[in-house]
Amino acid sequence: PEWLIADIAIMNAGGISVPIFTTYAAGDYEYIINDCSPSLVIASNNTQFKKIKKFVENIKVISFEKLESLSLTTSEIFKKDLKKNINRNLKREMPCCIIYTSGTSGNPKGVVLSHGGILSNCEGALDLVNKLLENKKPVFLTWLPLSHSYEHTIQFIQILVGAKIFYAESLEKLIPNMIIAKPTIMTA
C-alpha cells in the first residue's frame, strides 16, 4: 500500500509520478533517471536504494524505511503540515505519470499519461468491472508490478469500487496468496 500512497501523494501535490520496475538493469535506472530528471526519488527500501544510489547523488531521496545514507523517511514527512502542498488546480490534460517500457529494443521509452487519459481508462472499465462484481464484495489480488501501465491504472479502479486490495508477494507465491485473499477479481 505504500506505493499507492506515494503515487497518489505525488499526483495530489501536482507532481509527475515515474514508477520504475525493480528488475531493471543498472543502465536502465541510469537512463531513466537522466531522462526524466526527477526532483525527488522515493526508494522503497535499502535494496532498491543501492540499485540507484550512484545515479541520485544530487537528488533528494525519501523512503518508507531509513536508508543507509542521508535521507528523509516518510514518517518525518508526515510530521509536517502537508495541506499547503495540495494542488487544487489539477486538470485532465496535465501530465500524471511517465511510464517507461521495458526497453527490449534499446533504452526504455517514457510514455506520458495525463490525468484525463487515466480517468478515461477508468471510466471505460468501470461499467465492466461493476458488472463482474455485481452482488460481490470487491476483493482484488494485484500481481502485476505496480510500475506496469495496466496495473498503474487498475489501482484507481480498485479505489473507485471501494475494493479490498491484496498484493501478491511474488509470482511464485500467487496460488498461496489467492487462497488467503480469496479475490473476487484479478486482472492481467
Please annotate each region the language model reported.
Residues 1, 21, 140-148:
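Conserved AMP-binding
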Residues 3, 7, 11-40, 110-112, ...:
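Short beta-strand->loop structural element characteristic of the AMP-binding/adenylate-forming
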Residues 10, 41, 95, 101-104, ...:
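Conserved S/T- and glycine-rich ATP-binding loop of Class I adenylate-forming
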Residues 47-92:
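ANL superfamily adenylate-forming
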